[in-house]
């Protein structure tokens, strides 16, 4: 493996820059380098584009290394200014559009903000996503057991195993109505599936975690407590995993997975439709 090299990476767009970030991060993850990321959204006029160019040039002058620039910009006059910079510039969308244009024998009609902006064609989808987020927040950590039948998935697990961030990611990224229910220390003496969840067993998904990792996470929250002790964590994890087995609840060990990976595995295992926004 080559030596690790620091590089400055720009993600530039005339919109939110989310597309530039996602594709740029995917590309950069293939290289063993430490990067310093700079995201610049809404570069929509020439004066802002020139300021961005100056920022790129300044880093080049300071480091002697060309910054990497991933951009997605519709207006050619704005693109031209960025291309005059000292950065190594890559039009991430055009790299995919050009071969598709040839294959489909059809010219694209690029419009700024089409991917993540609001327009009459996607308002219903946007409203559905906001409703999913509201639902998920209202049903976080067992706050409310009302309307659980409206959930598309109900995550179960001990405290600090990743239920809340995964639920929110499912709602925000995919518009999934995700509730979650915690099993706490007081439940462990006689752990059973709550009556309110039994009719919804087809929507239940369990999260578990290595006790050592759980103890480390809890220690940051409540140092030197029984709650964070390895013995307590081992007991809780063992009890919850036994409950999953007894009730045939699909489950996943979240220890070595990111929130994005956990959410994607849940969608796959539960057969939930992915909806991109």
Swiss-Prot record:
Keywords: Kinase, Nucleotide-binding, Serine/threonine-protein kinase, Transferase. ADP binds at residues 157-164. GO terms for molecular function: ADP binding; ATP binding; phosphotransferase activity, phosphate group as acceptor; protein serine/threonine kinase activity. It is an enzyme of class 2 (transferase). InterPro entries: Kinase-pyrophosphorylase, PSRP. It comes from the Bacteria. It catalyses: [pyruvate, water dikinase] + ADP = [pyruvate, water dikinase]-phosphate + AMP + H(+); [pyruvate, water dikinase]-phosphate + phosphate + H(+) = [pyruvate, water dikinase] + diphosphate. The keyword Transferase applies. It holds the Pfam family Kinase-PPPase. The keyword Glycoprotein does not apply. Its EC number is 2.7.11.33, 2.7.4.28. Bifunctional serine/threonine kinase and phosphorylase involved in the regulation of the phosphoenolpyruvate synthase (PEPS) by catalyzing its phosphorylation/dephosphorylation. Belongs to the pyruvate, phosphate/water dikinase regulatory protein family. PSRP subfamily. This is Phosphoenolpyruvate synthase regulatory protein.
């Amino acid at each position: 493996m080559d030596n690790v090299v620091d590089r400055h990476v720009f993600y530039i767009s005339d919109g939110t820059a989310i597309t530039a970030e996602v594709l740029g991060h995917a590309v950069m993850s293939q290289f063993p380098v430490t990067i310093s990321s700079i995201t610049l959204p809404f570069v929509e006029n020439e004066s802002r584009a020139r300021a961005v160019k100056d920022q790129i040039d300044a880093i080049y002058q300071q480091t002697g290394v060309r910054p990497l620039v991933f951009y997605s910009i519709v207006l050619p006059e704005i693109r031209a200014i960025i291309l005059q910079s000292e950065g190594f510039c890559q039009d991430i969308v055009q790299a995919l559009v050009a071969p598709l244009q040839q294959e489909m024998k059809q010219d694209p009609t690029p419009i700024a903000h089409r991917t993540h902006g609001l327009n009459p064609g996607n308002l219903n989808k946007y409203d559905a996503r906001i409703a999913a987020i509201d639902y998920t927040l209202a049903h976080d950590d067992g706050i409310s057991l009302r309307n659980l039948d409206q959930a598309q998935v109900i995550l179960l697990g001990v405290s600090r195993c990743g239920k809340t961030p995964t639920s929110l990611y499912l709602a925000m990224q995919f518009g999934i109505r995700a509730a979650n229910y915690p099993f706490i220390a007081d439940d462990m003496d006689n752990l059973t599936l709550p009556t309110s969840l039994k009719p919804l067993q087809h929507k239940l998904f369990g999260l578990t975690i290595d006790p050592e990792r759980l103890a480390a996470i809890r220690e940051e929250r409540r140092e030197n407590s029984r709650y964070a002790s390895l013995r307590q964590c081992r007991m809780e994890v063992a009890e919850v995993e036994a409950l999953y087995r007894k009730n045939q609840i699909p489950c996943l060990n979240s220890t070595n997975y990111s929130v994005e990976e956990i959410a994607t595995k849940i969608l796959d295992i539960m057969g939930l439709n992915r909806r991109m926004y």
